[in-house]
Curated annotation (Swiss-Prot):
<dbReference type="GO" id="GO:0009506">
    <property type="term" value="C:plasmodesma"/>
</dbReference>
<feature type="region of interest" description="Disordered">
    <location>
        <begin position="422"/>
        <end position="482"/>
    </location>
</feature>
<feature type="repeat" description="LRR 3">
    <location>
        <begin position="169"/>
        <end position="193"/>
    </location>
</feature>
<feature type="region of interest" description="Contains the Ser-Pro(4) repeats">
    <location>
        <begin position="404"/>
        <end position="494"/>
    </location>
</feature>
<feature type="glycosylation site" description="N-linked (GlcNAc...) asparagine">
    <location>
        <position position="106"/>
    </location>
</feature>
<feature type="repeat" description="LRR 1">
    <location>
        <begin position="121"/>
        <end position="145"/>
    </location>
</feature>
<feature type="signal peptide">
    <location>
        <begin position="1"/>
        <end position="25"/>
    </location>
</feature>
<feature type="glycosylation site" description="N-linked (GlcNAc...) asparagine">
    <location>
        <position position="289"/>
    </location>
</feature>
<feature type="repeat" description="LRR 6">
    <location>
        <begin position="242"/>
        <end position="263"/>
    </location>
</feature>
<keyword id="KW-0379">Hydroxylation</keyword>
<feature type="glycosylation site" description="N-linked (GlcNAc...) asparagine">
    <location>
        <position position="60"/>
    </location>
</feature>
<feature type="repeat" description="LRR 9">
    <location>
        <begin position="312"/>
        <end position="335"/>
    </location>
</feature>
<keyword id="KW-0134">Cell wall</keyword>
<dbReference type="InterPro" id="IPR032675">
    <property type="entry name" value="LRR_dom_sf"/>
</dbReference>
<dbReference type="InterPro" id="IPR051582">
    <property type="entry name" value="LRR_extensin-like_regulator"/>
</dbReference>
<dbReference type="GO" id="GO:0005199">
    <property type="term" value="F:structural constituent of cell wall"/>
</dbReference>
<dbReference type="GO" id="GO:0071555">
    <property type="term" value="P:cell wall organization"/>
</dbReference>
Length: 494
């Protein structure tokens, strides 16, 4: 009797579970906006398919035997796209309504081209579902699209994680997942994409650290702004060959690595609204090609280096909302292409007259005598009475391995005189090693209190260096894919 009761309870629980699952699926399949509860349900549902981090997640796609495909690769693409269609839970614009049948090259948002390794066959080379407002997740079967060069799904409602099987996309050139609801740790699968040049993860919910290997990849553009990443920039940051990197609105802290000045290809860099708390590298002026330089809304200290006057291509320069001090060098305000110089909300005490003749500048809330809208004398006195900053105390340079002291071999004893018994020689004592007296301790001022600001969105980014040419498409091209990265950053999605 007891066993029958237990079985009845189990059956009842299973009934309620499946009823809950079906009711949620039906409600989510409607065109109404997804609530936060439904988003969490989708994320849980996605995780149910994972057996472990590297396990398969199948969508049980059945291929109708009556369907005829041009080649096996398009058959694999059909499986991938049908699995994705099953994983889509809301498609208010009916983008995927024509994802039916074997002619996948006619699917909306799918673009075919001749295979690079066999020009006689067509294969799926690009997917562009930007601004489609689709909700769902990315199934593992997308790894079957092994000829894919472009994958653009920005401004949708995809959530969950990036499939591990993406590592099979060896030809993937551009990956744009921006302005969605992806979450979890940094998708390390992107480190295994050998052809990747453009990576856009901005406006998502990724969190944790960013692997330092990202900055060793041969990328041209990195957008990871507006996430929840929290880490210190690694020493190899300057090894990155990118022309554009945007890290704004995360939780980075610590140093701006001195290796930054070695980024010879860099055109645009935006660090705004993080927690960086060091000095600017003294030789920052070596960045001769930078047009946009934004380190606003951080906790940077010390002077504005004189070498900034060597950034001859800079057009937008923003160091506002920091703890910088000293005088603004005249050479900065004389930069030939400078259009906008913002240095408000710091503690600068002097600026060259030429700075006041710039077409656009902002010097408010400093300690500049004779200028309007400055800090109070009390604020300025309190800050400027602190000990001067020792920029070397932050240890922001690459670590240097000190070589071991050379081993000095003692000279061999002279040969003994024949008529005398050989004398016994004791090796001479080693010369005393002089230890210099310890240098006096360098006073490091206490770190400034954390300052939290309400940050505006980053300035529009204008990219100037196009990547290598994308593969040719036989069908209509998606709008502006990979040419100068002209798509504006998506708005925050809340």
């Amino acid at each position: 009797m007891k066993n029958n009761t237990t079985q009845s309870l189990l059956l009842l629980l299973l009934f309620f579970f499946f009823f809950f699952e079906i009711s949620h699926s039906l409600s989510i399949s409607s065109n109404a906006p997804l609530s936060d509860t439904e988003v969490r349900f989708i994320q849980r549902r996605q995780l149910l398919y994972y057996r472990d981090e590297f396990g398969d997640r199948g969508e049980n796609v059945t291929v109708d035997p009556s369907l005829i495909f041009e080649n096996p690769r398009l058959r694999s693409a059909y499986i991938a796209l049908q699995a994705w269609k099953q994983a889509i839970l809301s498609d208010p614009n009916n983008i995927t309504v024509n994802w039916i049948g074997s002619n996948v090259c006619n699917y909306t948002g799918v673009f075919c081209s001749k295979a690079l390794d066999n020009r006689k066959i067509r294969t799926v080379a690009g997917i562009d579902l930007n601004h489609a407002d689709i909700a769902g997740y990315l199934p593992e079967e997308l790894g079957l699209l092994t000829d894919l060069a472009l994958f653009h799904v920005n401004s949708n409602r995809f959530c969950g994680t990036v499939p591990h099987k993406f590592k099979q996309l060896k030809l993937l050139f551009e990956l744009d997942l921006s302005n969605n609801r992806f979450a979890g740790k940094f998708p390390t699968v992107v480190l295994h994409l050998p052809s990747l040049k453009f990576l856009d993860l901005r406006f998502n919910e990724f969190e944790g650290t960013v692997p330092k290997e990202l900055f060793s990849k041969n990328l041209d553009a990195i957008f990871i702004n507006h996430n929840r990443f929290r880490f210190e920039l690694p020493e190899n940051f300057g090894d990155s060959p990118v022309s554009v990197i945007v890290l704004a609105n995360n939780h980075f802290h610590g140093c701006i690595p001195t290796s930054l000045v070695e980024m010879k290809n860099l055109n645009e860099i935006i660090f705004m609204n993080n927690g960086l708390n060091s000095c600017l590298p003294a030789d920052i002026g070596r960045l001769k090609n930078v047009t946009v330089f934004d380190v606003s809304f951080n906790e940077l200290v010390g002077p504005l280096p004189e070498s900034v006057g060597g950034m001859v291509e800079v057009e937008q320069l923003n160091v506002a909302h920091n703890l910088l001090s000293g005088k603004i060098p005249a050479s900065i305000c004389q930069l030939p292409k400078l259009e906008n110089f913002t240095y408000s909300y710091n503690f600068f005490t002097g600026e060259a007259p030429v700075c006041l003749r710039l077409s656009e500048f902002d010097d408010r809330r400093n300690c500049l005598p004779g200028r309007p809208a400055q800090r109070s004398s009390r604020q300025c006195s309190a800050f400027l009475s602190r000990p001067s900053v020792d920029c070397g105390s932050f240890g922001c340079g690459r670590s240097v391995v000190k070589p071991s002291p050379p081993i000095v071999a003692l000279p061999p004893p002279p040969p003994p005189s024949p008529p005398l018994p050989p004398p016994v020689y004791s090796p001479p004592p080693s010369p005393p090693v002089f230890s210099p007296p310890p240098s006096p301790p360098v006073y490091s001022p206490p770190p400034p209190p954390s300052i939290h600001y309400s940050s505006p969105p980053p300035p529009p980014v204008h990219h100037s260096s196009p990547p290598p040419p994308s593969p040719e498409f036989e069908g209509p091209l998606p709008p502006v894919i990979g040419v100068s990265y002209a798509s504006p950053p998506p708005p925050p999605f809340y």
